[in-house]
């Protein structure tokens, strides 16, 4: 239907559509259409939106009045320039004017032009549309003389007030109405019909088509003839905004609205005073009736006083809400205004005008605007909607979550990542189908992302922390990779999200919407883990961000600080529960613990927290007390029977852990919680007290002996000590074999010590295999290998073992025996350097490892600069001193090795300086030099140049470059030393985790532990052990711990809010708000003074009338049967006291009494 209508209209308008090229300074281009007064507004609207490509407006403001001869006041021009254009700019509005270059329309066009030049966003565009009568256009014949395919050239002229005017070059579109001479004013009627039609159209933010276009008329000044247009628009329920102080009809309406009385006499008096010339009595009567009818629709009238009210966009929105309130109290009727408030991001107006309590909102009413607030990044509105009834658990479905990901801006980094994953997926599907180009499937359809791409992006950022996210949805599984879900899959997307706050937090933080993400973090569960996840994502995205500003904002995100502060709040409340918070397996993050997520995010500051270090200390010492001295530990290690004495003291948990076997029903006692949370889960401790009492004393003694033995040797500190001692023994054995007992190949060797060394290395290999492949059953072998190789110390182990295997293989053959010795000697050096790893546990030596690592990186950069000078000097001196020596080994020795020795002071002057060269026999014969019979003679032709180059080389390398290296080392040391404590604590965690997971026995005895674990895995399938760093709590206790964390989070947020209120900036803002309120109150006092002055004038008028009546009765012959009543004493006394002052009082200016000029008083604005 629309297309047929368009074709019919195009035929009707053939030759009446065209472009205009404005000549002059501006040189702009516009579009025009010439219509008749009977043209359907729907067809004109179709031309604007379909043929000319204008987006449907989010607001239409029709400028009425302001085309008078009087000069515009400066403040009025500023209001229109700044206020109206700003309000239109925030939404992409249409501004309808007369389109002619005179009066206020000209000033408004200039404001639109300034906005267009300053605006950088093509989406937010202010469109100025002129609706002008054809017969009032200067040079209108030029618009008809142009060819159909060529724009009309139109000169812009500033003409004086008269019958014709030029079109304003700052307007982009014109609707030129060809009026019938028999029907004057058809242009005004066309404007009224156009506004009515636009107000019935629907548009939406985000393309939802859900909002009726709000239309508003702005009255500036205005002649009486505008009242007819105003009344017709009011009959169409279009609200009006009246600009106070602009003069004309606008001031008349403002005055009457302030007085609250619009009797005919008062209205006529105001008309006569405002327009003293050119009005007949019949016109005054007609205008008076129109004014009274207009004022009867006060709900559609709003006054804007630029001196007192807020900005114009605020007043426009209030006017629209006011018009809606007067018509209905249903929530559905306020959705358009609410959506407009969302579009303008005016949450203050939404709170004060829409959510004031007059309207009852349901969750279903707010779902649509909630989506718009999410898509358009309006966190204040999201918070407002949640506070007013939106239930996130009911609101967020997988379908809506997918729509949120599909709405990501193309300029956002997330869009690039999702697009990349989608292209990889399409390429994979194309390879399976063997169909060539993977993009053929896309066509011209709108691009959409699925959860497959989202899960892949999260996998890149969070690794196993997001395992299973959005990967098991029925729609995704049945869709088979298609971009759009089939109809039978759509109902699956209506399923509600299991963790809505987590999903929204991830969606917001992936787009770097930090304020939105902060709100979702504050509302969601497991806040410490979520903050660390946000820290990890922000760090990863900061590396990928191409724009410096985005990368800087991502790096400045304070999610690690949030995690630290919240954990501090938890730790100060309860240390035991805080420990459990660190090691419990989370529900929302794929069973990962807080410590796992912190490790993934490399949150060094979080690990440096006292609470985290206290837990690590407890884990490090195992069941032993943390105040056990090292001397006692060493003594017990070498004399194991001391473990059953009081030399080693254990924690009291072993006495409480007997309750572990009881059901997890009693959770109200803190002691019971500690027993459940902090026990090490020893199977021996799980026996009931009754069974213990029934056993014999000998059985009890054996159990205690075995328990203390197991607790001592399974502690990570004991495991570490055993590994260190045995590793030193390994290095001693290795050095002994290399130096004293490295026998020839079989049958002479190897010796018994060397065979023991081979077996020792074999146990080391078994341990490395266990660490790499026997860690997580759910992980693929390739993934396990990748994680193993990522650790630098594991790389060192792989190099050491590989060299040992190569050396052992070469050592067994006589031909490669010496090569095998060489390789094993180098391998010993690698094994010895592996000792650096044990320093990480020491508080002073641990940071030094980081310093050495950083300095090695600095050395590589230094060597680049050094090699440039070294090669330049070495090659040059070799060419100058020994041009006849063709031996390659000596060329490299003199060109590279000798200049390198110069740096350390080894300068053989007898080989460089001709004055100190010895008189030895030498030759210049190449053959003798190659045979080595005589040394080559140095060339002394340019020996002075060699000396000069040596001086420059030593100056640059020994003074400049070496001092540069020292400065780099000093800077690295200073940076690391400032954060030495943080680096050490992070290293310490990794070391504790490593030795916590290691078997109790050290190599080579570790093979016993490996055999034991293998047998247990075959017999019991799973090991019956509890990991102190990963605990899966019972559901009741886990829920209680989550509730406790939520309470601490609320306390933390309350403290943040209190600190924010007490900050100097917030206090200044609060004081400023109070001052503004006081100023508004003072402005109200002025209004009251004006009202009181009016009342005084009226009372004085009434008194004079009464005095006149009394005097008339007194002079007449009429008499009353009784005497006149006497005035009360208070009034009489007051009259006598105030009589002298009243005699001298002057009448207020602008409020004359009836007795002086016989005119009714009115308030003069």
Curated annotation (Swiss-Prot):
Residues 1156-1165 have a biased composition (Basic and acidic residues). Keywords: Cell membrane, Ion channel, Ion transport, Membrane, Phosphoprotein, Receptor, Transmembrane, Transmembrane helix, Transport. InterPro entries: Ion_trans_dom (IPR005821), TRPC_channel (IPR002153), TRPM (IPR050927), TRPM_SLOG (IPR041491). Ca(2+)-activated cation channel. Displays voltage dependence modulation. Regulated by PI(4,5)P2 levels. PI(4,5)P 2 reverses the Ca(2+) -induced desensitization of channels. Is highly temperature-sensitive. Residues 1132-1141 have a biased composition (Polar residues). The chain crosses the membrane at residues 716-740, 752-771, 793-811, 819-841, 851-880, 943-977. Homotetramer. Belongs to the transient receptor (TC 1.A.4) family. LTrpC subfamily. TRPM5 sub-subfamily. Contains two Ca(2+)-binding sites that are allosterically coupled. The binding site in the intracellular domain modulates the voltage dependence and the accessibility of Ca(2+) in the transmembrane domain. This is Transient receptor potential cation channel subfamily M member 5.
